[in-house]
């Protein structure tokens, strides 16, 4: 990497870091860089009992697994719980409640279920694994399962998990790379999966990628296991068995699973995704990214460090001066 390129990258990282200090509601939770894959799935039912699944290849090893529950009218999460594969779930992380003017105290919660899932998958035959799931509160609107696995046969990639709640005025996520992207390279991929709760009836959110609006229809209750929709099954998750959403899909076409490749250009060093809760009546509580290469999620890419906020301005000015001297 030449010095001009490195200075530009560090300056960009500083600006991204500063921008990231602005309040956001959908924030990075975990990032995995290496030979990783990810599976996502959703489920919802007013019966409060069903099946949620994961796709894991043979020979892979479970690194982490997280179970989310989306709720309504219960910001304290009173009585929220359940089981996964017959074991009790401790939902110990409240991901926050969407403030007014959004309705209904929309709140999601997360549990680490690695210790439950790992023994059931590691050393198994590979393929689709099904897990029994239950809920304990009528305020629970469904669940999402995110499973990250390592597989030495895979190339280097980045898995980023963000969670929280959907700001009415929008959230921006940046995936930042140390080298320019080449979307035309064989095997290049960039995938995004959203988890959205309390959504139906044309309630929708919007998604932009590097300034291109790719959907105004993110939402619906695609993972409802019941014959009809009702509070208690209004959830959709971009799942491993969903087709990728087409560009600007209709409400029924949007699967909340997206390939971002067509919205990238050769030479891009970041992927910027903006989600907006336009309806003020549903909750993007989770976003999962899986992209080729090494990336930082709302932070500089691996190997690039930035100073503490108190020294950002002086450091940036020094780098600008050095760059001008090199160009003169």
Please describe what each predicted stretch is.
Residues 11-16, 318:
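Hydrophobic helical h-region of N-terminal Sec-dependent signal peptides
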Residues 326-328:
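Membrane-interface capping segments at transmembrane-helix boundaries
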Residues 2-10:
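Bacterial N-terminal signal peptides that target proteins for export
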Residues 25-303:
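Disulfide-rich extracellular domains of secreted proteins
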Residues 305-324:
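A short, hydrophobic C-terminal helix/tail in secreted or cell-surface proteins
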Residues 19-21:
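N-terminal signal peptide c-region/cleavage motif recognized by signal peptidases
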